Amino acid sequence: MIELKHKNEGFSSVYKILTNQKIYKIYNHIAFSKYFRVRLIKFKKLYDELYKLKLSVNHKVIANRIIEIEEIESDQELNIKKLFNSEKLLKNFLNQINKISFINQKVSSKKIIHEIENYTKDNSQHQKINKKINELKKYLNIYHQNKICHGDLHLGNIIINKNRFFFLDWDYFVLSSYGYDLAMFAYLEKLSKKQIEKISLYSKVSLEEIYHYLPICQLLDYLYLSLTYKKNNEVVKKLKLKVDKFISSNL
């Protein structure tokens, strides 16, 4: 057994078994207590849908904290420059993201607001956010919250094989809108204004919707990192200032 990597600051680890070429993702107990991840047994319906729609490789929940994952490797290098320099590749990528919305929404009832509440309730550090939960809910509900979203799209979670995109690591899937997944990709990959305009054009999702969710991506990033790092961490402090400004200006 070869350990490939730790995920999410140590709440899971990924291993490869050489004898059967399978990947195993093993979760620690803090994944469900500290980081509020969904119990694996509830992932089965999602994984079935993903495999049926050819959005991801085959996953099997084989124990309370263990997932067996079919091994697949990219057969071509993928980076942001290459993605945006090829209209065909970018459209293919965006079409595959759009297919995520075809997943039966009954696989989950968890929305972004529930994710925010998990991090802020009973946490004195986030009382300012918690007091604005109702306003945040209204802000989110400007767009329908009825599509399954990956919730953590970045190049590290994307594989391209035989010109098909596969999305991995669905730990943060939620009900939201197509624009949220595009915003999260733009946020995590630090896309330029021109690149965001391009994904809006090809995806036919308005710039307004994508930009609407960018501060929500920043808020979630802050809440997650504040669990991982101390309050005086420079990244956390900078994010907090931006989150405070968003709350004061928009809620």
Question: Model-derived features: where do they sit?
Answer:
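Conserved hydrophobic "DFG−1" position in protein kinase catalytic cores
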Residues: 16-17, 26, 68-71, 159-160
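A conserved alpha-helical element in kinase catalytic cores
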Residues: 10-11, 23-62, 67, 78-96
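Active-site acidic catalytic loop and adjacent metal/ATP-binding pocket
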Residues: 13-17, 136-180
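ATP-binding glycine-rich phosphate-binding loop
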Residues: 1-19
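Hydrophobic residues embedded in beta-strands of well-ordered beta-sheets
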Residues: 2, 22-23, 66-67, 164-165
